[in-house]
Design a protein with these regions (language model features):
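Local sequence-structure signature of Cys/Sec-based thiol-disulfide redox active-site neighborhoods
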Residues: 1-22, 26-31
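Thiol/selenol-based redox catalytic cores and closely related redox-interacting motifs
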Residues: 33-117
């Protein structure tokens, strides 16, 4: 299982602690230094079944500075995925990629269900 995190994000730290407490092994990846590629994002988005907007860090500074709240609705899915691939800070975190699930953000109820804890 891969977990993409930003170490200065308190939610990410909380999520990693949760995984450790539940003895769930994972491979940590720094989302800012090694942002997801277009190909990865497209695969994860398809696998997730989630709306693409769930992959955006809507509370982030870059999202707000770029005015994406108003721009996304006029962009194709392909354009949105390419945009997400330009900067890991645009991506909702933590982003968890399991064998049969993809999770955005940390909601322990969703994590318990997905990871069968």
């Amino acid at each position: 299982m891969k977990v993409l995190v930003y170490r200065k994000c308190s939610t990410c730290i909380k999520a990693l602690k949760w995984l450790d407490e539940h003895n769930i092994s994972y491979e940590e990846r720094a989302i800012k230094e090694e942002n997801p590629t277009y190909e990865e994002l497209k695969e994860w988005y398809t696998k997730s079944g989630l709306p693409l907007k769930k992959f955006f860090n809507t509370g982030g500074m870059i999202y707000k500075e770029m005015g994406l709240k108003d721009k996304l609705k006029d962009m194709s899915e392909d354009e949105q995925l390419k945009l997400l691939a330009t900067d890991g800070m645009l991506v909702k975190r933590p982003l968890v990629i399991g064998d049969d699930f993809v999770l955005t953000g940390f909601k322990d109820k969703e994590w318990i269900e997905a990871m069968h804890v």
